[in-house]
Regions:
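Residue-level recognition of single "structural anchor" positions
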Residues: 1-302
């Protein structure tokens, strides 16, 4: 707004009624909804566009309640939300309510009703929020490390075209168990509670070795069932391998078992039932969502 227009606006203020003045005062003194969120976000450590150091960022006004900065090197402006899942997201006054809806595990329609937005907005917000969670998991595990895989039926939910004949609700895949209709998800957890899970393209030795090598410490003890892919990894990396068979009386061998990851499989699938099928395209986001709830429960700070 230019100076002349602003002065004209101020000249109209004496004409307001008392109710209108109270409303104007409330709007002027109430902080922007995004301000409370911005206070919890870390300061800009570098330019999100050219990765220049924070010392190269100069204050460049305000926008939607957020301080903007201009990079001295690339001359582009940014804020703490630039290039994050929350960038360009509207209705900031609803973000905390929607974050709480995620903690409560609400469906899209339930979250939409709680936040007063349409279901399409609620769906888009869900995956904006979950995108940030999908990559937050353990980077290194040691001690006794449990590993096991579970399978989800491949789903093209939400897509206009299907590469196969449609299945009716509650249908089953053309193949059983580990066939091409099923997507393997490998869960890894140590006794310290460090947790990681991976949606795999194929359940073979090459894929498992590539995933587990940077995750499992060389001095760890890997506990698994009798699947040969884990034996291949242990042999290739020199990791101690303890096989625990899924048979009565053999599921626990002293301190070695895979009960933690099997329990997580059960809780994950029971929790997923409320969504009546998850598109494989978004499966990683839902894995991150459940991982956050398992680790923090209702103690998540929104």
């Amino acid at each position: 707004m230019d100076t002349q227009a602003f002065q004209h606006l101020l000249s109209l203020f004496p004409q307001l009624t008392m109710r209108q003045r109270r409303l104007a005062q409330h709007e002027l003194t109430t902080p922007h909804p995004i301000t409370s969120l911005a206070a919890q976000l870390p300061a800009c450590r570098c330019c999100p566009h050219c990765q220049a150091e924070a010392t190269q960022l100069a204050p460049w006004g305000w926008s939607r309640g957020l301080r903007r900065y201009r990079c001295k090197q690339c001359l582009r402006t940014s804020s703490v939300l630039t290039k994050t899942p929350l960038a360009r997201l509207r209705k900031a006054q609803c973000w905390e309510d929607y974050a709480q809806a995620l903690i409560d595990g609400l469906t899209v329609r339930q979250a939409a009703v709680r936040c007063g937005v349409c279901k399409n907005t609620a769906f888009l917000w869900r995956h904006r929020f979950l995108k940030a969670m999908a990559s937050h998991q353990a980077a290194r595990e040691g001690g006794i490390v449990e590993v096991d895989e579970t399978f989800f039926l491949e789903s093209f939910k939400g897509q206009r075209g299907l590469p196969r004949p449609a299945r009716h609700r509650g249908g089953k895949g053309r193949t059983r168990g580990t066939g091409p209709d099923y997507i393997p998800v490998m869960v890894v957890q140590d006794r310290a509670g460090h947790h990681a899970d991976f949606q795999l393209e194929k359940m073979n030795a090459e894929t498992v070795i590539a995933v587990l090598t940077p995750l499992v410490s060389s001095d760890a003890v890997l506990c698994s069932d009798g699947a040969g892919v884990y034996a291949s990894f242990s042999k290739a990396q020199g990791v101690t391998h303890q096989v625990v068979h899924n048979r009565q009386g053999e599921r626990v061998v002293g301190a070695y078992h895979i009960q933690h990851v099997n329990g997580y499989h059960r809780r994950l699938k029971e929790w997923m039932e409320r969504f009546h099928g998850v598109a494989t395209h978004y499966l990683r986001n839902y894995l991150g969502w459940r991982r956050m709830l398992e680790r923090y429960g209702r103690e998540v700070n929104v």
